[in-house]
């Protein structure tokens, strides 16, 4: 496989959008609004339409570092993106070529899909038209009741273009990808009605993934803001995005997000179903829920959180909890079960739901509706009773060829985290675990991205496949654009730390490149290799804003006389490589004295030019 530069002709799927693009030496980061030291490139697979995007960071020493990229076409200078048009359908030809799907008319969009009763006007669509104006499309589904899932293909021994795509992204063989999906240890969320996505995989043998939540509420936000949050989250590394909208215009918001998203989109159908009955949980029915799932599957939702593990017998187990049931979906289903004193309609109709999801390749994210909402409630009987049911449902889903991952807590102190992953892997046959944190303490509102980032790094090291981010606004309010970035960066740190601990191929190459740049005082390389180049550069320039500071052999932390790396570098230059390890104290002192003289003889020059 070869890497091709985005500064050469763009990929075939993007050429239609490249009308006004210009060739440039460095990609313009349109989201951050700054020109930075990397560009979009593509790794070619076995076929001309399989080109996997990567981020190539150019170093001042002439080398480059290739990094995983989730930002989609928005950072390709050859692609003219427009949210009103949406992204090009990257996977469309792959889906059609398989010959096992068909287009059909689909269900009509109804006013209640957007939380609107009959003819009441739509509101809150600032600066964007109500209906997505992009290319007309009809939904697809499996022909003749076929399961058109990546799991079904993998079990038949087929390596799909999507599987090869993620193999390139993960630096593994396509057969490894197929094996992990076939065994149910990994999922490749890719609804056939979301052809715009760049395929990715979730499983413990692969890079740890990060999900970012967006979504409006009855109190705040608009469609425009949610689309912006989605593109902003993927710019900083979100591997998937969940639209958790609970206010007006739920259907319309989701359509705009899906048509513009290069990453898989997840939802909780129960939220929209509840809006259709004016928020009265007791009025929910299987028919309303089923219709909502079909509506979302036709739009292209890639994975759905389904709280089918919240059963009537488990509700009393939460009575003595400190914080009760904190999951929105869990509380809705618990209220329904108690109102009717019946078993959950999600649990009782689970196999029929599997048939629907298999027809569109929607992945299950089996929800943890009884997760602990405080560390006092961690690892209690209610939580683990639900987990045992999720294991049962996972086996049913796999029998129906539906890809499945399992959601996990929540609030768990550090000494109880490992029990969660060990039990989940045992009970759920190693299905991918997808956890919210967990938060390791409850005392830090406004800093829960940190309390949860600690738990996230630990549980990912032990095998969690995807982490749901937590922002500083957790428990306090709806996150804004800055909160989204902070949450994503925090969780990318946790995920990468886990990748290092697991020994994922290529993970340490990134760290080594930044360490070399730090030791050699290549400041621009340090900035450009950082997870957040903008903030790294900003912090450096707060105290050393002058351009010559970018070549200084110190920073404002220690100054020119006390920089440990400069001193270490001087020792290495004096004695060279391995010889320095055997230097005596007298030799080190002599070397330091010699360097002091050289510094004085050079006119006490602090700033040195970069090497050619």
UniProtKB/Swiss-Prot annotation:
**E.C. number(s) listed in UniProt:** 4.1.99.17
The answer, when asked if Lyase is one of the entry's keywords, is yes
Alphabetically ordered keywords of this record: 4Fe-4S, Iron, Iron-sulfur, Lyase, Metal-binding, S-adenosyl-L-methionine, Thiamine biosynthesis, Zinc
Which reaction is this enzyme known to catalyze? 5-amino-1-(5-phospho-beta-D-ribosyl)imidazole + S-adenosyl-L-methionine = 4-amino-2-methyl-5-(phosphooxymethyl)pyrimidine + CO + 5'-deoxyadenosine + formate + L-methionine + 3 H(+)
Q: What is this protein called?
A: Phosphomethylpyrimidine synthase
Q: Which cofactor does it need?
A: [4Fe-4S] cluster
Chloroplast: is it a keyword of this entry? Answer: no
Query: Quick one: which residues bind [4Fe-4S] cluster?
Result: 555, 558, 563
| A Pfam entry, by short name | ThiC-associated
Q: Which GO terms describe its cellular component?
A: cytosol
What does the record give as the function of this protein?
Answer: Catalyzes the synthesis of the hydroxymethylpyrimidine phosphate (HMP-P) moiety of thiamine from aminoimidazole ribotide (AIR) in a radical S-adenosyl-L-methionine (SAM)-dependent reaction.
NCBIfam families per UniProt: PRK09284.1, PRK13352.1, thiC
The cofactor binding remark recorded in the entry reads: Binds 1 [4Fe-4S] cluster per subunit. The cluster is coordinated with 3 cysteines and an exchangeable S-adenosyl-L-methionine.
Point to the regions of Basic and acidic residues compositional bias: 105-117
Which residues does substrate bind? 213, 242, 271, 307, 327-329, 368-371, 407, 434
To which pathway does this protein belong?
Answer: Cofactor biosynthesis; thiamine diphosphate biosynthesis
Task: Tell me which Gene3D superfamilies the record gives.
Answer: 6.10.250.620, Radical SAM ThiC family, central domain (3.20.20.540)
Q: Which GO terms describe its molecular function?
A: 4 iron, 4 sulfur cluster binding; carbon-carbon lyase activity; zinc ion binding
- Locate the residues binding Zn(2+): 411, 475
For biological process, the GO terms are: thiamine biosynthetic process; thiamine diphosphate biosynthetic process
Q: Segment Disordered: which positions?
A: 1-33, 105-146
Lineage, uppermost ranks: Bacteria, Bacillati, Actinomycetota, Actinomycetes, Kitasatosporales
Query: Which protein family is named in the record?
Result: Belongs to the ThiC family.
In this chain, composition skew of type Low complexity spans 12-24
